Amino acid sequence: MAVHKYYQLSGETIKARKPICPRCGNGVFLAEHEDRMSCGRCGYTEFKK
């Protein structure tokens, strides 16, 4: 997937479209699953309520 699809431009600000992994930092996003969000790099998982 192209990098420009991960960010949203509005005026002069850039915002990430997906949540960023708190362990890995900027540039690594959490994949959204039906019941959780997980990082493919470090394995960090957040479960949805």
Curated annotation (Swiss-Prot):
Its cofactor is Zn(2+). GO terms for biological process: translation. Pfam families: Ribosomal_S27. The keyword Transmembrane helix does not apply. One of its GO terms (molecular function) is zinc ion binding. Zn(2+) binds at residues 21, 24, 39, 42. Keywords: Metal-binding, Ribonucleoprotein, Ribosomal protein, Zinc, Zinc-finger. A zinc finger (C4-type) spans 21-42. Binds 1 zinc ion per subunit. It comes from the Archaea. GO terms for cellular component: ribonucleoprotein complex; ribosome. Belongs to the eukaryotic ribosomal protein eS31 family. Part of the 30S ribosomal subunit. HAMAP family: Ribosomal_eS31 (MF_00777). This is Small ribosomal subunit protein eS31. It comes from Methanothrix thermoacetophila (strain DSM 6194 / JCM 14653 / NBRC 101360 / PT) (Methanosaeta thermophila).
